[in-house]
């Protein structure tokens, strides 16, 4: 009886603290996050179809948000008449956005980005703005033009956070590699300067079957090739993709936000935002993870929760993501379409949740 009572009070304490025990399981047995670090969802802050010239009339998703010179910039994938391109919206308060249209164009026929030039991640080195974006020569048929494998990392640069962006076809950061853990996808991610080198937390996946994870790439020159880790940073069975990092100075802890791919009735889809935490940028324990946002605490998207991007604003951490108010989930590839962009918040400082023994 004492054990039951003490366990009950531990559970109540976790709920009050923003943590909770999670019991959801997946039909194929893929790992789950056993605890929660619940963000407070604000709802949709950017609707697809708001961009000029139909640039996002079929969807707005895969966001990358950053601050520069007192303004906020949001790169997002706009699903337009000819395919998906990285588009720009700007804001002063993270809640009201002005859509400005595409910032990249399709490459010429035969180029690695001839079918899509999307998901534009950025890094400012103090002089130049560097963009690492996702390119692919393959998509599904019209009208959706959903990017298909291989997912490649490509390079552009600019003199300001709003561009214009000049593609650097002469620079090949890295590519997919046959018979490796990144045979299908080696797409861009968050960059951290660590001592005399840069670390990129890139998205990696096999092509068949598709196993997804985050891994490390290293370089000392942003305009040179990167060296990819021989082994993934986290197990591919985690089924995660995309990265956005935040460093909590109060406890010297790194928090890596990512989206998880779940499965229901045989359909894989992005079902949650997870966060991992570590004191070491190069070592991450798959046990140290929690659910941040899913259908349980999202106000409007009851199934799909995709690709996080985090940015600090005062004493809160803003978490951008994409979702869909469709219910049930659209069948097949249609689950990728008609996304909108939402915003959720976590209070700072962040504290790593504590796993309670069963």
Predicted regions and their residues:
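Positively charged n-region of N-terminal signal peptides that target proteins for export
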Residues: 1-4
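Bacterial N-terminal signal peptides
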Residues: 8-18
